[in-house]
Amino acid sequence: MEDLEIFLKRFEDLLIDLATYNENESNDYIIYRKKLLSYDYLKDFIPDFIIKNRKPQFFRAYMQEIGGYKERRDLIYKGFERLYDYETIKNFDSDNSYNVNQIENFLERFEDLLIDLATENLKKDGFEEYSLFRKKFLTCNYFKDMPIFLKRNPKHFRYYMQSQGGYKERRKIISEEFNKLFSIIEGSNFNSDSNNKNKSINKKEYDIFVSHSSEDKEDFVKEFVNLLKQKGLSVWYDDDIVKIGHNLRKRISKGIKSSNYAVVIFSEDFFKSKWTNYEYDNIFLDFYDEEKVLPILHDLTIEDLEKFDGSIPLIRALSTKKFTVEEIIHEILERINEEKS
């Protein structure tokens, strides 16, 4: 919760500085900021209310006049709501000067920019300096030590966005993510957290969701799943759940949300499959903060894993090169029993 609050405050500070001219900026940051605002994402699509109507001295004075962090957050949040709600744009200000198409174009490009800043997409549209620019931008005070969910690998993040459909759906997803951030800060998702923690363990339908490549079924996964079941664990396993005519994406998403833990079996084939990439992205969104991702390296070492994907967070993993199936399951049972006790 604390890292989200820090991130959100820094993100708001960033939005304010993008919308104004902060006279205290370092020379280096002024250069990067100008480059950001002139980059293809936002070029010619920044609404007048950002470029012209917000003089920094008035904007910051207004923020200070309204009050502290909570009021400032509410103000910016309402601004986002208005951007998303095109029907009320005409009431955004008394002069009714905002153009719906202009704001829609800006919003679309700003979302693309946020996605790229939040991922490892270091080079785009021939902008050779983008790699240096992005690294500089993300290491400035706004995003230093930012939460892990923003350090996502682009192939997972972008695949997830693409899987949800077009611009309208993508905009809705991003809007929902902002709502989640704000609800977390308000504490609505953390009320009586310690009391609800153990209750949630018993509410889920499955103990474990098994994410794996179908290529690994015969030499490891089937035996692994059968032994889990023999130990009395309920397991979400695609061969048991997904039948002909089922929507695979919906079944996977439901399975992840209905499980207490996720076992991810990393292998060479795992990184080649679009479905395992989809699972992987959703698993880390749902489970990482609660330390409920249980990784297994199948015929891989940590060094091998980094070659495939250097963005995977540092979590203790068990390797099939070092442990038998029985030993791996013993470790998993200990981890689950530790949580329940």
UniProtKB/Swiss-Prot annotation:
InterPro entries: TIR_dom, Toll_tir_struct_dom_sf. SMART domains: TIR. Residues 204-336 form the TIR domain. It comes from the Archaea. Transmembrane segments: none annotated. It is an enzyme of class 3 (hydrolase). Keywords: Hydrolase, NAD. Coiled coil: none annotated. One of its GO terms (biological process) is NAD catabolic process. Pfam families: TIR_2 (PF13676). NAD(+) hydrolase (NADase) that catalyzes cleavage of NAD(+) into ADP-D-ribose (ADPR) and nicotinamide. In addition to ADPR, also generates a cyclization variant of cyclic ADPR (cADPR), termed v-cADPR (probably 2'cADPR). The TIR domain mediates NAD(+) hydrolase (NADase) activity. Self-association of TIR domains is required for NADase activity. This is Probable 2' cyclic ADP-D-ribose synthase TcpO. It comes from Methanobrevibacter olleyae. The lineage of its organism: Archaea, Methanobacteriati, Methanobacteriota, Methanomada group, Methanobacteria. The gene is tcpO.
